[in-house]
């Protein structure tokens, strides 16, 4: 392999590949409904409305909140242990707990990314007049007041959020920001803790873990709606009304049109369970000789509830379960579906659960790595601590 020219060795010649031209959120996404803020809304809908996805996210949050938090000193010397204790004290001196922050950081799994603004403080003790400097500690070191969540749906597409060549994060712009108007809602990258599920193409918005479940979710939602409609029609039926043709024609008089409108309203109210009875005229339809025509058609005005004859025996439940399995499988959480059928074994259950826990381990390790890189390192620089003594979460 040839040695690169010294004039080029330090240059970043190529580009990451992420579409940053218009500052759009996920500009490279193939599906229009998952691009930009529409995508944020759709993933939020999936997270909040689907029972299977809700169970997956709840299980993930509860498992990861219970993971012990350990600050590892660089060695066993008193100095190194002292610096590790400082980091522990920082995490314990925020307005919220670290568990609460992790719970919020896990929103990056749903949306692909999560931003938190770091609010720093001088640790001046619990009795200091300026509340912004309140702390359990009075050592004067820099600490952290809070890691303030910046909700995904408040992030505005912005051409100045990323470096157009490298794709590196420069900052984020919030809608209706309460920041200083001079900043115009822009929060620079050095004030942020930035979580994302993947760094492919250096896309700052990552990739939602629900992306591969989107198709199954769409079909599942449609089938559940169809199932509910089918059950309703089977139980309640569809009201059918009959009245003389002259009431329905274009040449109907105003009185006939008024009667027709009242009749249509009656049918609609019966369908919506807003009306408990229907009062109809008892007049019969007569032939040319003035005699009743007989049968159901003998009534001049009539209402009938039509129900299914049960001839279409399509069991929709297995189809719904298949899509629920697909959603769980897409995030290795298929163990949640165990017991929904007669098949399966303990060995299979343990294998699926172990796979899920392994994936959870990678998520929590990623969160701790980002905290070490984007929170502890800046604190180290602010306090002027020796870099070689910096511990890791």
Regions found by a protein language model. Give the residues of each.
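N-terminal-proximal low-complexity accessory segments that begin disordered
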Residues: 1-65
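C-terminal anchoring/interaction modules
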Residues: 1-18, 22, 265-298, 381-393
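Structured, mid-chain assembly/scaffold modules that mediate subunit interfaces
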Residues: 41-214
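Short amphipathic alpha-helical segments
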Residues: 78-86, 90, 94-97, 101, ...
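Short coil/turn segments at secondary-structure boundaries
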Residues: 102-105, 117-120, 232-234, 238, ...
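Conserved catalytic-core motifs characterized by acidic clusters
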Residues: 155, 172, 294-306, 343-348
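Extended, charged amphipathic alpha-helical segments
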Residues: 195-326, 330-334, 338-339
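C-terminal helix-loop subdomains that flank or include functional centers
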Residues: 314-393
């Amino acid at each position: 392999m040839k040695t690169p020219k010294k004039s080029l060795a330090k240059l970043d010649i190529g580009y990451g590949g992420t579409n940053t031209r218009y500052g759009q959120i996920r500009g490279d996404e193939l599906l229009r409904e998952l691009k930009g803020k529409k995508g944020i809304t759709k993933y939020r809908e999936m997270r909040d409305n689907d029972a299977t996805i809700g169970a997956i996210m709840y299980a993930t949050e509860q498992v990861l909140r219970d993971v012990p938090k350990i600050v590892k000193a660089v060695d066993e010397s008193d100095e190194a242990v002292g610096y590790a204790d400082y980091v522990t004290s920082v995490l314990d001196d925020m307005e919220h707990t670290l568990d609460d922050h992790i719970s919020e950081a896990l929103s990056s799994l749903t949306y692909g990314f999560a931003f938190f603004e770091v609010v720093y403080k001088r640790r001046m003790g619990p009795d200091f007049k300026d509340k912004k400097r309140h702390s359990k500690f009075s050592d004067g070191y820099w600490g952290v007041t809070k890691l303030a969540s910046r909700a995904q749906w408040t992030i505005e597409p912005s051409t100045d959020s990323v470096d157009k060549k490298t794709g590196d994060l420069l900052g984020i712009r919030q809608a209706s920001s309460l920041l200083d108007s001079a900043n115009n809602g822009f929060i620079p990258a050095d004030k942020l803790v930035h979580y994302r599920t993947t760094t492919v193409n250096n896309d700052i918005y990552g990739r939602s873990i629900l992306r591969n479940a989107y198709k199954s979710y769409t079909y599942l939602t449609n089938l559940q709606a169809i199932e509910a409609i089918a059950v309703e029609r089977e139980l309640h039926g569809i009201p059918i009304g009959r009245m003389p043709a002259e009431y329905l024609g274009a040449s109907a008089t105003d009185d006939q049109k008024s009667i027709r409108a009242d009749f249509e309203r009656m049918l609609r109210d019966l369908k919506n369970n807003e009306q408990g009875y229907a009062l109809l005229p008892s007049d019969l339809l007569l032939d040319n000789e003035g005699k009743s025509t007989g049968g159901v058609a003998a009534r001049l005005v009539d209402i009938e509830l039509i129900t299914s004859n049960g001839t279409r025996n399509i069991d929709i439940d297995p189809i719904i379960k298949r899509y629920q399995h697909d959603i769980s499988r897409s995030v290795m959480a298929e163990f949640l579906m165990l017991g929904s059928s007669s098949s399966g074994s303990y060995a299979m259950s343990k294998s699926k659960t172990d796979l899920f826990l392994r994936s959870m381990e990678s998520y929590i390790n990623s969160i701790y790595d980002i905290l070490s890189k984007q929170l502890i390192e800046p604190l180290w620089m602010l306090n002027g601590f020796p870099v070689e003594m910096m511990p890791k979460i």
